[in-house]
Amino acid sequence: MSATSLVRSSGKKKALVKNANLLKKKTSPSKTSEEVSKYLIKGLNLPIVYSPSSPERADLKFLTGWIKKNHKEIQRDLLIYGAILFRGFNIGSSENFEKVALGLDPNLSEAYLGTSPRDKKTKFVHTASELPSAYPIMQHAEMSFLNKPPKKLFFYAKVAPNKNGETPITDLRTVLRDMPSHISDKVEKQGIKYIRHYDGPGASRYSLWKTKPWNEMFKTTDKKEAEKEIKKQDFEHEWLPGNKLRLINSQVGVRKHPIAGSKAWHNHSQTFHIDSPRLEYKYVFKRQKTARGLGVYLILNLLTGIKKLFSKSEDLDVHATYGDGSEISNKDIRTIVNVFWKNIQIFSWQKDDILYIDNYSVSHGRLPFVGPREIQVAWTE
């Protein structure tokens, strides 16, 4: 892929030339060592896979030592590809996963201001999401609605699903490249405005779009303590009847990589848009072709229509608009979803896989599944 092919004929988005310089290097992974093999999965552009070259090099002690010895090379590959998959190593536990993550980056964080329900496993390790297995999680950069999102993410296949349940990833630099200019220009200029509603402690309301309670997010039932973090994050807030909380904030929609300087699509517009799940499920059903998938797709379309008919957009559980407050049209959100699926990369989990992601370059999501599956996550500051 040449650099010039990444730049539109109109001459806009000059920063994408930097992206091109990174992306064109993907065709030639750095040299495989005698200890660890490096390769791309057939048909995919990412992640780059690291695997032990022999069984005796699959144990945890070897892996942590190899990471320490080759840290600079690993970071170089992460900068270029945006995602590295450690496959074939014997991890075995959440504690060992945490050790590997700390070896890759010692700046792990416990703070989580995202919307998904998660269970804590160790100091820095949580389950990736406790959302129902039939529900898709759209592509997103982790906590992109914050001023300072995590720089890196780590996913661990504690229990790999037998079928489906993949964690697709997408290069956000190519998403920005392929986004029509009438959308990308607006998002880059205005950013995205987010409106989120959180139930209070003990609430039992059911909604497909419901976030976790505010006391779980802020780890306190004291409103004054919650307000301290709200102020720190530059959120506007309003306490609503029934002990509910509304949070409003505006954030950039395109971010520069702190090291590479390359630009990437970086927002939760499709994740928080009411039409996204049903649009996403069209692709899910096309891929999985299950009776359950068809049923969920039809139900999502019905429930979305009812929700839009009887709810104001500003009262939805989660909502995203352009930065000036204008609605992201159904046509625009459909285009955004289509661009992601044009560039999405999907691989099947294997037990003990660790996926290392540059959160400023690569997004992630989740496809529906049936049966056992436990993917764990850790993230940096």
Named regions from a protein language model:
Residues A83-I84, N107-L113, N162-P168:
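Short secondary-structure capping/junction motifs at helix and strand boundaries
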Residues S2-W66, E73, L79-I80, A134-I137, ...:
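Active-site environment of non-heme Fe oxygenases that use a 2-His-1-carboxylate facial triad
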Residues F89-I91, E142-S144, A157-A160:
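Beta-hairpin (beta-strand-turn-beta-strand) motif
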Residues P106-R118, R373-E381:
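C-terminal end-helix/capping segment
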